[in-house]
């Protein structure tokens, strides 16, 4: 009998995720959690499911402790992170106990006007998820953009370029260039498919529509009734173009991100000026040392080393470009107002055509 434990079985890698499928009940649970926690934007939860042939099938979810506002400090971040990890492990153990799927495939969060990308919490959390499972996703529900009846949900992953750059943790200009990392390819969006469970589908098919009562009105009477109910004056209520809070908030967020970007650019400009001054001093020192070596060569003396400037001068450290990269990516996200204002622009076009005629 052969010993199978000595065989080196290659580990099979799952293909990259191309689509995310969720059940409608799961989506309703996420919406309820985010709405009940509003206005707290630290609402997060965990996603459970399985990925099959590039399709991530999310079957269930559960809530996690919310993110605190003072969680930026190292102590609070460590304590809150351990509490969430312990809560997640306990919930997964309970799911395993009842025989449910326990594959941890990502997390969800509630956001306001998609103001999530510039937060270090989102990037660090998603990086940790994809480091453990490359097919993990971040599922976003935007409450403000879903207030007018349009369901705004997105599934994101960090791109391989960002994951490779984050692995180095240098975030210098040379690192970003070597990985071809730009603000446009920090994250990638995955298509979402929402469907009903088989039991819900069977229930919907089993429901019967109530019979429509037969009309006793004649055609002439129905026409007279319609004409009598017509309004005397024309109304343009359907062409109301109220901007709403989400558009104003989107502009405010865009202005705040622009101010933060200018601040980061100022820090980078200060570093470049300081670096130029130090390099000028180094060049002057090297020129002076070369002249001194020429005099020593005329006196048949050994030349002095030219790299002693490394002990005398210290070049300023290059600033990390992670914040600038995320802010630029958030600005690109905020400028995509056309995705959120299609109905608003349609009403404007209708008003223009009405007055033009």
From Swiss-Prot:
- Name all MPN domain ranges: 20-162
- Pfam families named in the record: eIF3h_C, JAB
The UniProt keywords, alphabetically, are: Cytoplasm, Initiation factor, Nucleus, Protein biosynthesis
**GO MF term set:** deubiquitinase activity; metallopeptidase activity; translation initiation factor activity
Please give the biological process terms from Gene Ontology that the record holds. formation of cytoplasmic translation initiation complex; translational initiation
| One Gene Ontology cellular component | COP9 signalosome
Q: Taxonomically, which superkingdom?
A: Eukaryota
Q: Where in or outside the cell?
A: Cytoplasm; Nucleus
Q: Which PROSITE patterns match?
A: MPN
User: Where are the bilayer-spanning segments?
Assistant: none
Q: Which purpose does this protein serve, as stated in its record?
A: Component of the eukaryotic translation initiation factor 3 (eIF-3) complex, which is involved in protein synthesis of a specialized repertoire of mRNAs and, together with other initiation factors, stimulates binding of mRNA and methionyl-tRNAi to the 40S ribosome. The eIF-3 complex specifically targets and initiates translation of a subset of mRNAs involved in cell proliferation.
Name the protein family.
Belongs to the eIF-3 subunit H family.
Which proteins does it associate with, and in what oligomeric form? Component of the eukaryotic translation initiation factor 3 (eIF-3) complex. The eIF-3 complex appears to include tif32/eif3a, SPAC25G10.08/eif3b, tif33/eif3c, SPBC4C3.07/eif3f, tif35/eif3g and sum1/eif3i. This set of common subunits may also associate exclusively with either moe1/eif3d and int6/eif3e, or with SPAC821.05/eif3h and SPAC1751.03/eif3m. The eIF-3 complex may also include SPAC3A12.13c/eif3j.
Q: Which PANTHER family match?
A: EUKARYOTIC TRANSLATION INITIATION FACTOR 3 -RELATED
Name of the protein described by the UniProt record: Eukaryotic translation initiation factor 3 subunit H
* Source organism (scientific name): Schizosaccharomyces pombe (strain 972 / ATCC 24843) (Fission yeast)
